[in-house]
Amino acid sequence: MNQEDNTGGGGIFGLFKWTKDALFGTDISPSMKYKDQEERRDRSRYAQDDTNFSMKFGNDSNRRSTNLSRSNSWSGLDSTLHRKYELLPEYNENGFNSIVNGDHHSKERIRSLRSPAPIVPREPLRNEPTDTFGHRLHTKRRTINELSNSQIPFIPPQEDDPLLSKLFNKDGVNEVRRSPYKLSVKDIPGKFPSPLTKRDEIDNYYVRDEDACHNNREYKKAYFDLFAQMDLNSRDLEDLCEDVREQREQFHRNEQTYKQAYEEMRAELVNELKKSKTLFENYYSLGQKYKSLKKVLDQTISHEAELATSRERLYQEEDLKNFEIQTLKQRLSDLELKYTNLQIEKDMQRDNYESEIHDLLLQLSLRNNERKDTSAGSNIFSTGQYDRTPFHNGNNSYDSNSHSWDTDYLKNIDGFIER
């Protein structure tokens, strides 16, 4: 078993040693050892073996503790260790290996896990039911208010702890608590003596009574029962890890499906937006054309109204002009008729005047002839003189077309008529 411990091999001996050291050899449980540790610790505070030299035993409290560093199970953690022990690599939120992809948060976490864990932390995280006796004895218990900001909710230890009750009888524990002697670390079963312990103390350590040996055998049986239970828990943990891995793969597949659907939906949305933009532009241009056509239509309607008004006015003016034309034509007809009547009347008057003149001239000439005949004899009128009168031209008839009037003679006739 020592060879297995020195070589760092696995198996039941390594598991037994690791569990034993976790329960009794250190001041912190394995569940608390790798939770939320500081990134950088003072490596000189930890020993390189499984002995805690900073513990104080009895009256040796003034003894100077040796500052040594100690390695842990995270030392040398790399991909080879993952393949050797079939460990799952660290994945970031995107589903890739955070160590390979250079995730800063995961690198910090791995660095903190690989750094040595403190044997006696300055501020323990929380009191768990699986804490060892040494941690409960030498560690100040934190209050609930101090643990209120923790990521994991605080669970106070139960009065009847199932793990501790399986190792120890409750009556025995109560009896030890009621004893007047103070419980020391050396009284804890399974505790190995410190290398700095005196030789006589080592000899006394191996000298035990029969009851102590019997109790140790019972404890050993309980240890193996716990190891079997831990083996079952490890198998359940492996199954759980497998389920987690399958769920993670399913999650990544679903995420890829959702991502592809999102990309398709996004592309479709972009196309719809482009179509909507084109439709809006066409609608806007159509609206502008509609406004211009409506404006032209309004102008056309206004022009048509003006044209109808002008046409009506022209029709009225045309009717008025036609009425005036008819009136003028009627007046012209009346004037023409009146002119014709006047012309006829004038012709008749002229004929009457000519006939009267002819009669008067004839009377005058007869009167003159009678006067001459009485005064001068029968030769008063010569033939030549008689022929010069316009009314005595051959057949003693009046020529209406003859214009050779003796104006002086007619003047005398007019003067005679006036007298």
Swiss-Prot record:
Residue ranges, compositional bias (Basic and acidic residues): 34-48
Region (Disordered): 34-76
Keyword Cytoplasm: yes
Highest taxon listed in the record's lineage: Eukaryota
InterPro entries assigned to the protein according to its UniProt record, in alphabetical order: Bbp1_C (IPR029330), Bbp1_N (IPR029328)
Coiled-coil spans in chain: 229-355
Entry keyword set: Coiled coil, Cytoplasm, Cytoskeleton, Phosphoprotein
Any matching Pfam family: BBP1_C
Keyword Amino-acid biosynthesis carried by entry: no
Residue numbers carrying Phosphoserine: 29, 73, 115
Start-end of Low complexity biased regions: 64-75
CC annotations in GO: cytoplasm; spindle pole body
Compartments in which it is found: Cytoplasm, Cytoskeleton, Microtubule organizing center, Spindle pole body
Subunit-structure text: Homodimer. Interacts with KAR1, MPS2 and SPC29.
Protein purpose: Component of the spindle pole body (SPB) required for insertion of the nascent SPB into the nuclear envelope and for the proper execution of spindle pole body (SPB) duplication. Connects the central plaque of the SPB with the half-bridge. Required for proper localization of CDC5 at the SPB and for proper M-phase progression.
Similarity section: Belongs to the BBP1 family.
Protein name per the record: Spindle pole component BBP1
Originating organism: Saccharomyces cerevisiae (strain JAY291)
Gene from which the chain derives: BBP1
